[in-house]
């Protein structure tokens, strides 16, 4: 069975430039929306997963979903600190950080609208446990003082959080003495200060979370057994990366489901547009189809040729839409994580999986939009097609 050359199919698309551009443009818009939504969810998840270190473990109160909801009293923290699975630093001290985590309300710099921001009580050991955090402006806060440092996203996005400015919360004025960058992690959306000073100011007696590094990643199971077998403890331990990944799950799913639904609705219009274009192509090339059949090309060859034309149309739209979506990686975004009730800044992330999904989506639109017109072309008899000429 002779096949119609691909070059012939491509030339037919170029011969109808206006309809090709309009149809491919419609598909490109749908793919742009589809890819952008997937990039949004991927960026959120990547940011929160990157927040944790692979060898770090976080301990929170049993049943708590976030650090803000958690509370660990000092006796419980002291028990955990004795576990032999916790790594020690060069000075012989256990690499464990006891941290209060609180939400405060700050006005956004541009709009003045209030939003929740995480305040974390940090310790020198806590800084050592997060090597991705580095001061990029000013200096680190001094322990025992009312000094704080702000993540880059907070310093840029909220009033009073830039270096040299003052924030008032917990009945005290706090001076921003530095800005830190934590890479593409959730710490960029936090403010850090001295842990003990924050506990006193917020009149708290318990920590929100314990973070420590393991001697050996395999020691996590032993830590969990120690906690579960001790009736004095009402806490649980999780790998830090898993803990922060879980916090992104609900919002990422919501974004993905909403975006996919919108994309499917939009795709119906794009499919109809492709179908109209392909039907018009079949109608204008009736005599051509008859000639191809007279030259010995089978119905299947005609079907495949018109389907290939629709698939090429979808592929062109997919590549254009994906190219447009890729520029969204340069756009920073912040939103409320309704699982933690705090502001989080992140960026769109384009992954190979998203590229594959977007192109596959474009090809599916092309196939669905082109199948019926292609089937109509394949069903034409030689006599009827030539007579129509």
Where are the model-predicted features located?
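Short, membrane-interfacial amphipathic segments enriched in basic
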Residues: 1-7
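C-terminal membrane-exit region of the final transmembrane helix in multipass inner-membrane proteins
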Residues: 3, 354-389
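Hydrophobic alpha-helical transmembrane segments of multi-pass inner-membrane transport and secretion
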Residues: 17-44, 252-288, 311-320, 365-368
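Hydrophobic, regular-secondary-structure patches
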Residues: 32-118, 137-139, 144, 200, ...
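Mechanotransmission and gating elements of multispan inner-membrane complexes involved in transport
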Residues: 87-90, 107-114, 140, 156-260, ...
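Short beta-strand boundary microenvironments
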Residues: 115-157
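Transmembrane alpha-helical interface segments in multi-pass membrane proteins
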Residues: 266, 279, 284-333, 357-369, ...
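Short juxtamembrane loops and helix-capping segments at transmembrane helix boundaries
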Residues: 328-356
């Amino acid at each position: 069975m002779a096949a119609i050359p691909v070059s012939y199919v491509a030339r037919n698309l170029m011969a109808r430039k206006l309809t090709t551009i309009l149809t491919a443009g419609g598909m490109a818009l749908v793919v742009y929306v589809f890819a952008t939504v997937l990039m949004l969810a991927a960026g959120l998840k990547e940011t929160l997963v990157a927040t944790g270190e692979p060898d770090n473990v976080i301990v929170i109160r049993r049943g708590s979903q976030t650090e803000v909801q958690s509370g660990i009293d000092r006796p419980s923290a002291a028990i955990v600190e004795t576990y032999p699975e916790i790594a020690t630093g060069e000075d012989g001290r256990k690499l464990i950080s006891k941290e209060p985590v609180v939400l405060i309300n700050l006005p956004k710099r541009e709009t003045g609208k209030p939003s929740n921001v995480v305040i974390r009580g940090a310790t020198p050991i806590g800084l050592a446990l997060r090597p991705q955090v580095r001061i990029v402006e000013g200096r680190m806060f001094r322990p025992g003082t009312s000094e704080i440092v702000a993540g880059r996203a907070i310093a840029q996005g909220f009033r009073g959080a830039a270096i040299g400015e003052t924030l008032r919360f917990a009945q005290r004025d706090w001076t921003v003495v530095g800005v830190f960058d934590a890479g593409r992690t959730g710490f960029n959306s936090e403010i850090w200060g001295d842990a003990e000073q924050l506990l006193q100011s917020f009149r708290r007696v318990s920590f929100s979370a314990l973070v420590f590094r393991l001697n050996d990643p395999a020691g996590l199971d032993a830590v969990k057994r120690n906690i579960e077998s001790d009736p004095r403890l009402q806490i649980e331990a999780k790998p830090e990366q898993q803990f922060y990944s879980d916090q992104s799950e609900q919002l990422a799913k919501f974004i993905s489901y909403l975006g996919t639904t919108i994309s499917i609705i939009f795709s119906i219009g794009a499919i109809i547009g492709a179908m109209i274009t392909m039907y018009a192509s079949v109608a204008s090339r009736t005599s051509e189809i008859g000639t191809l059949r007279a030259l010995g090309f089978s119905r299947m060859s005609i079907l495949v040729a018109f389907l290939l034309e629709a698939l090429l149309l979808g592929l062109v739209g997919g590549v254009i839409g994906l190219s447009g979506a890729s520029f969204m990686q340069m756009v920073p975004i912040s939103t409320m994580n309704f699982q933690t009730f705090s502001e989080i800044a992140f960026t769109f992330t384009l992954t190979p999986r998203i590229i594959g999904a977007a192109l596959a989506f474009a090809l599916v639109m092309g196939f669905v939009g082109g199948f019926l017109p292609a089937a109509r072309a394949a069903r034409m008899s030689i006599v009827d097609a030539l007579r129509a000429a």
